C-alpha cells in the first residue's frame, strides 16, 4: 500500500492501521500475556539481552508498562482475543527516534545498525543507515569472523544480522551484539555512539551502556521495560513482521523526514 512521498502524521496513522503495523495487530492477546508471564518468571530468553533482575517479577507490572507504552488492553482479566498497538504511540515514538537520529547526524556520530527480524525490518535499518551516512555519520563496520551458538554474525547493507545455513536468521538473542561489542573493544576500536536495532541486539547494547534505540512488538516487553527504566532511549511499538516489508516504507519515509534526513 504505497503512499506517494512522505506521509503526514494522520496519513501515517491510517497506513499503520490498514497494514496492521499498529491498531488491531496479528499477535493475539494470549500470546502477549504468555510472553509477559515468561519474562516475569525469569525466563531469560524473553529478556532480550537485558539484565532485569527481580524488578519485573509481577506480570501485572509488565502489563501496566505495555498498556502505557504500546497500547495493549490494560485489563488483566482480558485473556484471549484481539490485542492492539496504539498507532498514536507508534508515531510518538517515531518522533522521539527522529530526534535522536537528528542528534547523531548533527554530531557526526558512529552508528551501528542491527536486526533480529531481517524479514521485516532489514530495509528500515538499511534506509536509515544510508541517510545517516549521507549526513556525515560513520556507519560502524563490524569485525570479521564473529559467531554465536546460533550462527555467524554478518553485515549486509550496513546492518548486522545473524546468518545460519546461508540464511538470514530470526533471533531475539543479545549474544550477537555481545560478540560485536566485545570484538570492537578487543581490537581497540571505539564503541558506537548509537545503536539502532531491535530485539536482543538493542537490549544488550543498552545493557552495555551504549545509547540504544529500536523497535519492538507487543509480545516483546523487555525493551519497553528498559525504556521505562532509562536503559534504552527510545523504543517504537509496532508489529515487526507484517505481510510485506514494503508496508514499512511510509513509516521510514516519515521517520527520516522528521529527522531532517530525507
Question: What residue spans do the PLM features occupy?
Answer:
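Long, charge-dense
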Residues: 127-180
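Histidine-anchored nucleotide/phosphate-binding helix
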Residues: 98-102, 121-136
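Short, acidic/small-residue loops that bind anionic groups at enzyme active sites
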Residues: 134-145, 210-225
